[in-house]
């Protein structure tokens, strides 16, 4: 009887460990690689002005965006806010936490950066979807 009580007590004290979401898993992979100088093409998939959609060529040095389309980066300019890979992975995680009705999540298996991401947050609302595409990734 003591053993049964100990087993039940032990099992009740255990917590269920939730698996990491894909964005967190890939952010961890990205961080393991310690990449701080890189470039990539970034495209938003949305019903947005073409200047906002892109594609935009982004250059990151020492973990900060330095240029967008060959010009010094300024978030207030017509392209809107651009993201480094870790920032984009945080945006993706925040969107996963919103529990979209549909999502497509594809990541580079070597480095963990997102390649194709898409979220639809409501089947009943048109044009609220958002997606991101990263191509031409290169470590500098």
Give, region by region, the residue ranges found by the protein language model:
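Short hydrophobic/aromatic-rich beta-strand segments that constitute the beta-sheet cores
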Residues: 40-42, 65-70, 116
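Mature extracytoplasmic domains of secretory-pathway proteins
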Residues: 59-103
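Bacterial signal peptide processing site
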Residues: 15-18
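C-terminal motif of bacterial Sec signal peptides marking the signal peptidase cleavage site
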Residues: 11-13
């Amino acid at each position: 009887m003591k053993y049964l009580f100990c087993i039940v007590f032990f099992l009740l004290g255990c917590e269920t460990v939730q698996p990491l979401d894909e964005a967190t898993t890939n952010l961890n992979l990205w961080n393991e690689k310690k990449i701080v100088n890189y470039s990539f093409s970034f495209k938003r998939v949305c019903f947005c002005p073409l200047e906002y959609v892109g594609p935009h060529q982004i250059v990151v040095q020492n973990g900060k965006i330095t240029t967008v389309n060959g010009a010094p980066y300024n978030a207030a300019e017509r392209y809107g806010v651009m993201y480094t890979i870790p920032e984009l992975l945080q945006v993706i995680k925040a969107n996963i936490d919103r529990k979209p009705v549909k999502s497509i999540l594809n990541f580079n298996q070597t480095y963990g950066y997102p390649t194709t991401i898409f979220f639809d947050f409501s089947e009943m609302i048109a044009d609220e979807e958002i997606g991101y595409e990263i191509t031409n990734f290169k470590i500098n």
